[in-house]
From Swiss-Prot:
Family: Belongs to the bacterial ribosomal protein bL36 family.
Pfam families recorded: Ribosomal_L36
Disulfides per UniProt: none
Entry's Gene Ontology BP terms: translation
Single Gene Ontology MF annotation: structural constituent of ribosome
InterPro entries per UniProt: Ribosomal_bL36, Ribosomal_bL36_sp
Cellular component GO terms held in the UniProt record: cytoplasm; ribonucleoprotein complex; ribosome
Species per Swiss-Prot/TrEMBL record: Helicobacter pylori (strain Shi470)
Superkingdom field: Bacteria
SUPFAM superfamilies: Ribosomal protein L36 (SSF57840)
Protein name (Swiss-Prot/TrEMBL): Large ribosomal subunit protein bL36
Keyword terms: Ribonucleoprotein, Ribosomal protein
Amino acid sequence: MKVRPSVKKMCDKCKIIKRRGVIRVICATPKHKQRQG
């Protein structure tokens, strides 16, 4: 899980979702998981 100021899709499988006001990226590749913090 990477915490960064701007989240971007890193591949085609990445999905940007909003959970409890937090923007997250979920992906099949664990390395691509991100959240905005």
